[in-house]
């Protein structure tokens, strides 16, 4: 009888102990995820903030998901900011492509790093002609590593008015540098198309060209093509091919931003777990 009584008491003690341990573990985990989140928000370095968001996510803090994605964006994207990457020119070759930083769509912008949010704001201001963004573009152009006088060409916009609003001030700034030859008046607009950055469905936009290349750039051989944002790169490739028809050779592409991919929860969690394993 004593043995049975002892067994019952031991079982109850073990049961209570397990529940206390689980309760304490859950309580610790709850506190830990908030502590990690604070580190993510207020860390002194980019690495520290990424570490905080990653551990908050792994501890169960769902709010950390997109914060971690943005803080670790270079691990999810093939291209890195201010680093030359081969760009398929659509003509069977590649040319160097450089962008300043990642551009975040509005639905995830609040999750971005300070640098990403600043760049995304600059892109929008540049589109509307409120800033020339010349410092950003000049930094990116320097990373191409090209020599000689560079002819600067600008991507066509939906209409002539938007084109000059966007690029006139930038072209003026470029003209101050002897190694840059901006050709703002390199095309004639013959029609108006739907604006891409204001469209909710880019697939609905016509790919037909709404410009004709002017004679003053025909045959130019050392050209850089400038645009605000690269998303798929299809528009850039289309214009490169159009320029080639006029004997124009594009040797580099520079954009303010590279639009990021919106990742699934599974993709983000997989990378977080991979990073955690690498540390240990």
Residue locations for each model-derived region?
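Feature marks short, highly hydrophobic, charge-poor N-terminal signal-anchor/signal peptide-like helices
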Residues: 1-10
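Alpha-helical membrane-embedded segments
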Residues: 12-19
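Short glycine-rich phosphate-binding loop at a beta-alpha junction
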Residues: 149-158
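Charged helix-capping and loop-helix junction motifs
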Residues: 166-172
């Amino acid at each position: 009888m004593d043995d049975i009584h002892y067994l019952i008491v031991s079982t109850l003690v073990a049961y209570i102990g397990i529940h206390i341990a689980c309760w304490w573990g859950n309580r610790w985990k709850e506190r830990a995820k908030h502590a990690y989140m604070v580190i993510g928000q207020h860390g002194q370095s980019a690495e520290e903030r990424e570490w905080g968001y990653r551990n908050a996510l792994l501890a169960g803090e769902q709010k950390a998901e997109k914060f971690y994605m943005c803080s670790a964006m270079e691990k999810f994207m093939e291209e890195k900011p201010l680093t030359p990457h081969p760009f398929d020119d659509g003509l069977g070759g590649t040319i160097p492509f450089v962008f300043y930083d990642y551009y975040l769509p509005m639905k995830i912008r609040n999750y971005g790093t300070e640098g990403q949010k600043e760049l995304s704001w600059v892109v929008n201001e540049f589109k509307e002609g409120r800033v020339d963004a010349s410092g950003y573009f000049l930094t990116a152009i320097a990373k191409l590593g090209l020599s000689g006088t560079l002819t600067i060409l600008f991507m066509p916009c939906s209409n002539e008015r938007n084109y000059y609003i966007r690029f006139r001030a930038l072209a003026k700034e470029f003209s101050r540098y002897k190694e840059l030859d901006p050709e703002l008046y390199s095309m004639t607009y013959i029609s108006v198309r739907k604006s891409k950055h204001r469209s909710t469905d880019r697939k609905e936009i016509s790919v037909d060209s709404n410009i004709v290349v002017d004679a003053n750039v025909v045959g130019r051989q050392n050209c850089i093509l400038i645009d605000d944002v690269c998303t798929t790169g299809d528009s850039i490739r289309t214009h490169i091919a159009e320029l080639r028809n006029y004997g124009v050779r594009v040797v580099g592409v520079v954009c303010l931003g590279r639009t990021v991919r919106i990742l699934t929860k599974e993709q983000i969690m997989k990378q977080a777990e991979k990073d955690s394993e690498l540390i240990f």
